[in-house]
């Protein structure tokens, strides 16, 4: 085993005779001498090789990524040749002997950080991709994050408990990954979407403080920050308030940032309600690294005969709202403006329009529409010459979501986002339920085990759409990185929740009977949170896709190009499971 990684060699090793083992990152052969950049996981070390060294001739045919063992003396570099960009840049290894431990074929793509390689080939040769400095750094960062989490929770008297991967398929979630049972005819296990009920049962078992860094599985459509299998930091506590959980998680995240980024976060995380988040930012996971808040023009627009305004106001909960982009009047071409309009209209709003500010006046297609309210508009948006105002009309929720999406797009296009910022935010006071028009019933905003603002199940049936939950989400830079709540801990309340979700008694007793019975054996009040580890590390690593912080991820279609998974299986395996394939 190495006593010191070669990337960590420095002046303190000068004069020592060492054997350095690593991969050839680069080789420059000048005929009678050669320079090799030898790499291990901690960095690079320059090796100087004279032609008098045995096996020097073998270097002519050596490919990058071959593995060498080089024995020699560590010497200080001449000041003129010091490399300040690597940790070992003040020294080099003068080779005395070279052993080729393993040769490499020609690479399918260059591993230099700046070299462009397609996603498919990177996934197929992931073991090569992970040799790149950036990818190694991402995995080391992930390790630092998980270590900081474990250290913090262990210090807070949490118990790390594993829960099973072969569980029961239940409704009220994304699609399950199913595992057919060979022993139990025509029956299936499901891979867990989360250990939700199991961690609650651990509270019923009296453990009081539980955590687990656990793999979860959801058969859902993929995007940049999602994978079919992902890792979450799962925790649960008994006898706690919402504030207790938030304080614990906030302290943990501050410890994570300090351990992984060296940044001391001293301010308390801001807290806003779900309603405030939607009203101000058009999103339940707002990015607060930039301003551009939504403004409501509904009252200002009432009585205005403009067809643009009236078309939106006639909608149910019709509103007129807008955002102001600073210095954006000349920032976009006609084609870009058409793209922005399509982005907004895809949310199902009634109308979209823009105006620019010139010489203190609103100009453009809405100039006459707001001619009597020019001063009010400028004050409301704090608009100045050169700014552009985007107006959207339609039903409240769709307008808010459209402007929320537009707000983020504009911030990226106008380069308003400070990528060095880490803006955490708590979103609280969520509605307990939301109406699903496709299913024609209520569904839980979080999950069906979330406690309402009061517990008596009989009260929930009066005005379910107005019922608030005791839930909270933690947001970082516009990403929801975690969510949790206080949980229902009485059977009557849990049954009432299932019924509000349109479940029949025989159905919820079949699917959740074991859990309902557990609630009758002295179940403590409890709450917790699940934190998306992949997404958190992605943000801390300043990556745009969680695949960059997972060692062996699936691609955008949910396949593993390296393992060639999923794949067909033998007929014999299917027969043992009593399964037959259909086209």
From Swiss-Prot:
Assigned keywords, A-Z: Aminoacyl-tRNA synthetase, ATP-binding, Cytoplasm, Ligase, Nucleotide-binding, Protein biosynthesis
Family matches, as SUPFAM superfamilies: Class II aaRS and biotin synthetases, GAD domain-like, Nucleic acid-binding proteins
Broad class of where this protein is predominantly found: cytoplasm
Any one Pfam family match given in the protein's UniProt record, by short name: tRNA_anti-codon
PROSITE patterns to which the protein is assigned, alphabetical: AA_TRNA_LIGASE_II
Gene Ontology terms for molecular function: aspartate-tRNA ligase activity; aspartate-tRNA(Asn) ligase activity; ATP binding; catalytic activity, acting on a protein; nucleic acid binding; transferase activity
Residue span of region Aspartate: 196-199
InterPro entries linked to this entry: Aa-tRNA-synt_II (IPR004364), aa-tRNA-synth_II (IPR006195), aa-tRNA-synth_II/BPL/LPL (IPR045864), Asp-tRNA-ligase_1 (IPR004524), Asp-tRNA-ligase_1_N (IPR047089), Asp/Asn-tRNA-synth_IIb (IPR002312), AspRS_core (IPR047090), GAD-like_sf (IPR004115)
Subcellular location: Cytoplasm
Entry function: Aspartyl-tRNA synthetase with relaxed tRNA specificity since it is able to aspartylate not only its cognate tRNA(Asp) but also tRNA(Asn). Reaction proceeds in two steps: L-aspartate is first activated by ATP to form Asp-AMP and then transferred to the acceptor end of tRNA(Asp/Asn).
Subunit-level organization: Homodimer.
Protein name (record): Aspartate--tRNA(Asp/Asn) ligase
Organism whose genome encodes this protein: Streptococcus mutans serotype c (strain ATCC 700610 / UA159)
């Amino acid at each position: 085993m190495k006593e010191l990684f070669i990337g960590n060699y420095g002046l303190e090793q000068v004069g020592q005779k060492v054997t350095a083992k690593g991969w050839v990152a680069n080789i420059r052969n000048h005929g009678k001498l050669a320079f090799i950049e030898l790499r291990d996981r901690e960095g690079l070390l320059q090796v100087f090789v004279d032609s008098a060294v045995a096996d020097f001739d073998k270097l002519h045919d050596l490919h990058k990524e071959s593995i060498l063992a080089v024995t020699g003396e560590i010497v200080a570099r001449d000041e003129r040749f010091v490399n300040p960009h690597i940790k070992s840049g003040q020294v080099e290894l003068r080779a005395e002997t070279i052993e080729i431990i393993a040769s490499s074929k020609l690479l399918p793509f260059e591993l230099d950080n700046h070299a462009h390689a397609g996603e498919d080939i990177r996934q197929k040769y992931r073991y090569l991709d992970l040799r790149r400095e950036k990818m190694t750094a991402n995995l080391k960062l992930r390790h630092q994050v998980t270590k900081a989490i474990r250290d913090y929770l262990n210090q807070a008297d949490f118990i790390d408990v594993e829960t099973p991967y072969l569980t029961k398929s239940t409704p009220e979630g994304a699609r399950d990954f199913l595992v057919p049972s060979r022993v139990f005819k025509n029956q299936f296990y499901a891979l867990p979407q989360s250990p939700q009920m199991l961690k609650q049962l651990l509270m019923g078992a009296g453990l009081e403080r539980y955590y687990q860094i656990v793999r979860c599985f959801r058969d859902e459509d993929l995007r940049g920050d999602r994978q079919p299998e992902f890792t979450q930091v799962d925790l649960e506590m008994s006898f706690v308030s919402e504030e207790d959980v938030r304080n614990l998680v906030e302290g943990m995240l501050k410890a994570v940032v300090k351990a992984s980024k060296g940044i001391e976060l001293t301010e308390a995380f801001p807290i806003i309600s779900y309603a405030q988040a939607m009203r101000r930012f058009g999103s339940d996971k707002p990015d607060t690294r930039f301003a551009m808040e939504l403004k409501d023009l509904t009252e200002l627009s009432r009585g205005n005969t403009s067809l643009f305004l009236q078309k939106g106001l006639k909608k149910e909960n019709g509103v007129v709202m807008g955002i102001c982009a600073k210095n954006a009047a000349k920032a976009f071409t006609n084609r870009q403006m058409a793209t922005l309009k399509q982005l907004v209209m895809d949310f199902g709003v009634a109308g979209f329009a823009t105006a620019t500010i010139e010489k203190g006046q609103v100009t453009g297609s809405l100039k006459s529409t707001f001619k009597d309210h020019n001063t009010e508009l400028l004050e409301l948006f704090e608009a100045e010459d050169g700014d552009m105002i985007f107006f959207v009309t339609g039903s409240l929720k769709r307008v808010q979501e459209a402007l929320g999406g537009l707000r983020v797009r504009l911030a990226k296009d106008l380069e308003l986002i400070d990528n060095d910022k880490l803006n955490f935010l708590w979103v609280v006071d969520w509605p307990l339920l939301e109406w699903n028009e496709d299913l024609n019933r209520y569904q839980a905003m979080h999950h069906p085990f979330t406690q309402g603002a009061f517990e008596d199940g009989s009260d929930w049936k009066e005005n379910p759409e107005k019922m608030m939950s005791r839930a909270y989400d933690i947001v970082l830079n516009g990403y929801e990185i975690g969510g949790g709540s206080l949980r229902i801990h009485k059977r009557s309340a849990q049954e009432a929740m299932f019924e509000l979700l349109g479940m029949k008694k025989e159905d919820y007793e079949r699917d959740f009977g074991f859990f309902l019975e557990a609630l009758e054996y002295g179940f403590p009040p409890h709450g917790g949170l699940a934190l998306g580890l992949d997404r958190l590390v992605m943000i801390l690593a300043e990556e745009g896709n969680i695949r960059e912080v997972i060692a062996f991820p699936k691609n955008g279609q949910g396949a593993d190009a390296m393992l060639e998974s999923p794949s067909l299986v033998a007929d014999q395996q299917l027969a043992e499971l009593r399964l037959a394939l259909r086209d």
